[in-house]
Curated annotation (Swiss-Prot):
Entry superkingdom: Eukaryota
GO cellular component: MICOS complex; mitochondrial crista junction
Species per Swiss-Prot/TrEMBL record: Zygosaccharomyces rouxii (strain ATCC 2623 / CBS 732 / NBRC 1130 / NCYC 568 / NRRL Y-229)
Protein name in UniProt: MICOS complex subunit MIC12
Pfam families: AIM5
Physiological role: Component of the MICOS complex, a large protein complex of the mitochondrial inner membrane that plays crucial roles in the maintenance of crista junctions, inner membrane architecture, and formation of contact sites to the outer membrane.
InterPro entries registered for this protein in UniProt: Mic12 (IPR031463)
Main subcellular location of this protein, as a coarse class: mitochondrion
Subunit structure: Component of the mitochondrial contact site and cristae organizing system (MICOS) complex.
Localization, UniProt: Mitochondrion inner membrane
Transmembrane portions of the chain: 7-24
Bilayer topology term: Single-pass membrane protein
GO BP terms in the entry: cristae formation
Membership in a protein family: Belongs to the MICOS complex subunit Mic12 family.
Length: 97
């Protein structure tokens, strides 16, 4: 009985793989494969390696600059402490309402 179950499961998996291969690569002249992102990237990389594809260098845009201000850690801790004190006071006074 167990050999029959193993044979059936192997046959089912093989049939599923064969059907998916057929529909992905063969059916409609490989439409899904030809339009897949993976193939497009592979073709572009192969073109760069062969030298037939031009590499356009990207220039960083200056319009998206982010200004970072570094504050001392003591100021950050003071802000956190003050926020906790305010939250505690609000919680305490909310009991009387």
């Amino acid at each position: 009985m167990s050999k029959l179950i193993k044979l059936t499961s192997i046959t089912a998996v093989s049939s599923t793989l064969a059907a998916s291969y057929y529909f992905y690569f063969v059916d409609r002249d490989g439409f899904h494969y030809q339009n897949s992102q993976w193939k497009k990237i592979g073709d572009k990389v192969q073109g760069i390696i062969d030298g037939s594809e031009n590499i356009n260098p990207s220039t960083p845009s200056n319009s998206n600059q982010v200004i970072v201000v570094k504050r001392p850690m003591t100021e950050t801790m003071k802000d956190l402490w003050n926020e906790q004190i305010r939250n505690t006071a609000n919680w305490f006074y909310s009991w009387g309402k």
